[in-house]
Amino acid sequence: LRLIEKRKSVEGVENIDTLLASERSPNIPTASVDVVLLVDAYHEFSFPRDVMTGVVKGLKSSGRVVLVEYRGEDNNVPIKRLHKMTQHQAKKEMSAVGLQWLRTDDYLPQQHVMVLSKL
């Protein structure tokens, strides 16, 4: 987080906030964010439902979640299975916390970039 804050300062970026999450909460104020970007992180959460419920609570009504995960459907991606996620799995788990899948962008060679919104 310090590196991001330093780079924001150097480049004069004002529209990015960093927050230190806990194991069970993203610590996002209610209805305060436009986008939550999770890169190769979701599958590591010890309490994914708790964290994602907090993410949804923190999204503005038009907010989005961008979930980037290694393609679980692709056996050619040289990552252990526990560090991958299928689109089907992501859609199921995200819908359980109040998110709906909008699209998947596949411009990265080994990862899905899944875009979701509040239901």
Where are these regions (language model features)?
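A short beta-strand submotif of the Rossmann-like class I SAM-dependent methyltransferase core
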Residues: 34-39, 51
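Core SAM-dependent methyltransferase catalytic element
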Residues: 97-119
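A short glycine-rich, Lys/Arg-flanked "PGG" loop and its adjoining helix->strand segment in the class I
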Residues: 49-64
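A short acidic, Gly/Pro-enriched loop at the edge of an enzyme's catalytic core
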Residues: 24-36
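A short His-aromatic
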Residues: 27, 41-44
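Conserved class I S-adenosyl-L-methionine
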Residues: 1, 64-91
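Class I SAM-dependent methyltransferase SAM/SAH-binding core
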Residues: 1-26
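Glycine-rich phosphate-binding loops of nucleotide-dependent enzymes
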Residues: 33, 62, 89, 103
